[in-house]
Regions:
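Bacterial N-terminal signal peptides
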Residues: 5-15
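A cross-kingdom marker for long, charged
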Residues: 215-298
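Acidic/His-rich structured neighborhood in mature extracellular/periplasmic domains
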Residues: 84-193
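Start-of-domain marker
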Residues: 21-87, 98-100
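Sec-exported extracytoplasmic/periplasmic mature domains
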Residues: 50-58, 149-152, 265, 269
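Flexible, glycine-rich surface segments
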Residues: 156-249
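Sec/Tat signal peptide C-region and signal peptidase I cleavage site
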Residues: 16-20
Length: 298
């Protein structure tokens, strides 16, 4: 009887959908500026960060293995004090598969220039959903959730909104620590608070709707209906030009310039000249400093 129960349990588990973690994350730690000492400790830190990002279940969504988000975190550390305080920067890049192709579209390429944290060998980096106790855990948690929200936005209209409460609580908790840098909306550059604003403000919802159309109605149809897909992409750029006139400070514009400007240029290289010229004009209005890159569309 016990054997029968075991067999039934195995069969039941086999029928359940496997749930994978959301992120397929890689972590690189660049410490050249800190000298050659302590490399063993840095490798330990890298492994801890990889485990934190790649093994934590960030949401209650059911991801299959093939649906995991490809993302890389590159930490470049510039300074270290004797007390174990580090200063540096973080570059994050994420990609999304395009339906019916082997192409991976960039969905995020951002640089956070002001990361600071204190870390000593052996310090635990344990995820806490509401009130992270370590600035490095708070930093990684925020960007992990932000990457997932951006990915969800690309698959369903405003799909990332479900993570707004989590992100808001995390930012509020981090801002309660005066010595944790990079969280205040008054700091220069694209602080984490400003990125949160992008996901929570009604003013940015139209940008996020464009993000959805660009991916689901544009890129995901390129393999089956390339002409219709390019038409959608041109419609989206027209909408973005109008949005820029009324919402020019949105973080969406900097993210679009980093990820979608090069992509659009490449996608339209072999399009009819009329489409290339129209796209070039709209991208020039969106990104006034991109004139040299746009020469490829002439």
């Amino acid at each position: 009887m016990r054997l029968l129960h075991l067999v039934l349990l195995v069969l039941t588990l086999g029928l359940l959908p496997l749930r994978a973690q959301e992120l397929r994350a890689t972590v690189e730690l660049r410490t050249e500026a800190l000298g050659s000492e302590g490399q063993i400790h840095y490798e330990g830190l890298r492994r801890q960060l990889t485990d934190l990002l790649g093994r934590t279940r960030w949401t209650d969504l059911a991801y299959k293995e093939g649906e995991r988000i490809n993302v890389s975190f590159i930490f470049t550390l510039h300074e270290r004090s004797e007390a174990g305080e580090y200063k540096g920067e973080l570059v994050i890049s994420a990609r999304r598969p395009i339906y019916g192709t082997d192409y991976m579209s960039p969905t995020l390429l951002l640089r956070d220039p002001s990361i600071t944290f204190t870390y000593l060998p052996g310090d635990p980096l344990t995820y806490q959903e509401t009130e992270p106790e370590h600035p490095l855990v708070a930093l990684c948690s925020f960007y992990a959730l932000y990457v997932i929200a951006s990915d969800l936005d690309s698959f369903s209209p405003l799909g990332g909104s479900r993570l707004q409460p989590r992100l808001s609580a995390l930012v509020a908790s981090a801002m309660s620590h005066p010595d944790w840098k990079g969280w205040s909306s008054t700091e220069r550059g694209l602080s984490r608070a400003r990125r949160l604003e992008y996901l929570t403000s009604q003013e940015d919802e139209r940008y996020r709707q464009c993000w959805y159309r660009y991916h689901r109605e544009g890129l995901d149809r390129l393999s089956s209906s390339p002409e219709e897909a390019r038409e959608v992409l041109l419609e989206v750029t027209k909408e973005l030009v109008e949005l820029r006139k009324i919402r020019s400070r949105s973080v969406a514009l900097s993210d679009l310039e980093q990820t979608k400007l090069p992509e659009l240029i490449q996608l339209f290289r072999s399009a009819p000249q009329s489409e290339r010229l129209l796209l070039s004009e709209r991208l020039r209005q969106l990104f006034p400093t991109a004139g040299e890159q746009l020469q490829a569309l002439r």
